[in-house]
Amino acid sequence: MNIRNVVIALILTLAPASIGAQESETVYNFLRLPVSAHVAAIGGENISLAEDDATMIFHNPALISGVSDKTINLNYMTYMEGAKNVSASFIKLAGERSSWGVSAQLMDYGRINQTTDYNESLGKFSARDIAIGGTFAYELTDRISGGITAKFITSTIADYNSLAIGIDLGINYLDIDRGWSLSAVARNLGGQIKAYEDEFERIPFDLQVGVSKRLMNSPLRFHATLSRLTDWDEAFGRHIAIGADVLLGENIYLAAGYNFRKAQQMSISDNDGSSAHGAGLSLGAGISLQRFKLHIGWGKYHVSTSSLLINISYTL
């Protein structure tokens, strides 16, 4: 089996999800997808959502400092036809100021048609990506937390596989009294240690900064995140994701957001001009009880279909 034919088939299948130039130059782009349904709902990019939410281990390792002890979390995301994204995490306190967590993520692309250079069918092959991580976070002061995640990443395409090591570094400043949360994250530092064949490829490094602001004496909270701050080949607006929450008491929220990059990447030209067909827009809601939490988010990450994200967390 020729890896060239296999990779071409996979690229053609996944191309609508990776329209940007930076995606086409990196591997393991499933790491760019949101895991948190709440993050998905407020624009698909967020690193400053400082809540008791175990899914933030996938977005900013510093934020597990605010997660309840012994919290287990299960997640599911629909993607394009035949593909699924599942993940899980567990958070444990380790003293008054430190926390640790473990996480795992699987993107299964299902069975994909393989063809020759002359479009002759050679049957089907499977492809999947897996990331397994360990996280440590520490409260440096009463308002500042830092965290690190070390990830082992593997990808299999038919009979070929690759391995990589990735590091996430995060910091968060949280002022509860004034409703401010500010964060900075460097995601996916590292690289491949085993290539599919002979050529090593880059993993999707992303430098991000973000802010969340709760309007005091109001149910409104706003979010803004700047991503891919080392790539300025694209317009400034494409680096921005924004969102807002309506907090209905202490336990329920409604959320909406907009991601300018997704809207432009997945815009489709038609007779009336260019239309994103809902790409960029996201919605969601969640409920938090004493031990049980349920979050649901909706957004578009592939031109062929929208995605539904479901998070379930339980504190033991």
Q: Predicted segment positions?
A:
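Subset of outer-membrane beta-barrel
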Residues: Q22-L316
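Bacterial N-terminal signal peptides that target proteins for export
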Residues: M1-V7
